């Protein structure tokens, strides 16, 4: 019985670590703004996104990398240009009832 509880605790810890990284990535006003712009405009390159964000390309690239590493956005390279878009599947999963069940079992 103790072994089962330890395994469940480790599994929950791993799940929390997974979500911690995702939520840290979006817990920033600038990154939320980037996500909102991508929601409204779809796929965009840094050169078009930077003026909308009123941010240098290097600073924008820093924020995009964090969102990419968390799999919140996707990147597609076409020639020398990189285009970014929201990863809808990941966002749907992140905002799904599955996560709700961890904290509010009655919703499941």
Spans of model-derived segments:
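Short capping segments at the starts of secondary-structure elements
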Residues: 29, 41-45
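A short acidic, leucine-rich amphipathic alpha-helix
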Residues: 48-50
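Pre-recognition alpha-helix immediately N-terminal to the DNA-recognition helix
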Residues: 32-39
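Beta-hairpin "wing" of winged helix-turn-helix
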Residues: 69-78, 85
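Helix-turn-helix DNA-binding motif, specifically the short coil turn and the N-cap/start of the second
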Residues: 56-59
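Conserved segment of winged-helix/HTH DNA-binding domains
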Residues: 18-19, 40, 83-108
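N-terminal leader segment of winged-helix/HTH proteins
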Residues: 1-26, 70-72, 92-94, 106-108
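Short, hydrophobic-biased segments on the C-terminal half of alpha helices
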Residues: 35, 64-65
């Amino acid at each position: 019985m103790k072994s089962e509880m330890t395994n469940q605790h480790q599994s929950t810890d791993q799940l929390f670590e997974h979500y911690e990284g995702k939520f840290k990535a979006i817990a920033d006003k600038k990154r939320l703004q980037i996500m909102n712009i991508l929601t409204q405009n779809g796929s965009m390159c840094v050169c078009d996104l930077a003026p909308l964000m009123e941010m240098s390309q290097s600073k924008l690239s820093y924020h995009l990398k964090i969102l990419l590493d968390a799999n919140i956005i996707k990147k597609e390279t076409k020639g020398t240009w990189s285009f970014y878009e929201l990863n809808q599947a990941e966002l749907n999963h992140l905002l799904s009832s599955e996560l709700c069940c961890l904290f509010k079992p009655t919703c499941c």
